[in-house]
Amino acid sequence: MICAFLRVVQHAEKLHGSLGRQLLPHFVFTKACFKTQPLRWGLREQKITVQPRTVLRFTQKTFWTQGPDPRKAKEDSTKQVSIRRNQREETGVSMSQKVREAGRDVSYLIVVLFGVGLTGGLLYAIFKELFFSSSPNIIYGKALGKCRTHPEVIGVFGEPLKGYGEMSRRGRRQHVRFSEYVNNGLKRIRVKFYIEGSEPGKQGTVHAEVEENPGSGQFEFRYIFVEVTPTRSIIVEDNRSEQS
């Protein structure tokens, strides 16, 4: 009986020990959790209280970084000064370019006006030579026409009759020689040219003079004569007695 009682006691101790070993970790873990629970809440509260500080710090830092930087302000002022300087230089350059372009345009205008004036003068001279009665060429043509219709001139020189101006050293025939002068307020023009016909060795010198008519403004012949030899001349037209 005693042996059986001892076995029961041993068995009960073993059972109690195994249950204690099984319940001890759970008890320890629960107790640890219970003890650390305020610590967790404290950490959460600390995290909650710290978080606004972090936000404020971040906001202050952001505000501080967005504030004016002396270096950046200096660089901006330098850039503004350089931009203004460049604008002034561009304005000066543009003004000088405008002045040069204006001078160039004025020079071109002067050249164009000079060319137009020169062309107009040449055209006027050509028109005067071809159509004005005071032109030496017009006087020469009219005098040669009168010589070609004069019977005595044709009889001496033959036909066809041709006229020409002064001979040069190279044998070229120059323009008709002429001279101008004024008598009693009236302009007079003298011309001199040469004629030849079909008769060999025959050459005559034609002298003609015109005078301005005060009434019509046209030039009329005072005389036309052909010098055949130094001692012989053919009078084609003579109005000196009427005009004088």
From Swiss-Prot:
Residues 69-78 have a biased composition (Basic and acidic residues). The chain crosses the membrane at residues 107-127. Residues 1-18 form a transit peptide. Keywords: Membrane, Mitochondrion, Protein transport, Transit peptide, Translocation, Transmembrane, Transmembrane helix, Transport. GO terms for biological process: mitochondrial cytochrome c oxidase assembly; mitochondrial respiratory chain complex I assembly; protein import into mitochondrial matrix. The keyword Membrane applies. InterPro entries: Tim21, Tim21_IMS_sf. It is found in: Mitochondrion membrane. One of its GO terms (cellular component) is mitochondrion. Belongs to the TIM21 family. Participates in the translocation of transit peptide-containing proteins across the mitochondrial inner membrane. Also required for assembly of mitochondrial respiratory chain complex I and complex IV as component of the MITRAC (mitochondrial translation regulation assembly intermediate of cytochrome c oxidase complex) complex. Probably shuttles between the presequence translocase and respiratory-chain assembly intermediates in a process that promotes incorporation of early nuclear-encoded subunits into these complexes. This is Mitochondrial import inner membrane translocase subunit Tim21. It comes from Mus musculus. The lineage of its organism: Eukaryota, Metazoa, Chordata, Craniata, Vertebrata.
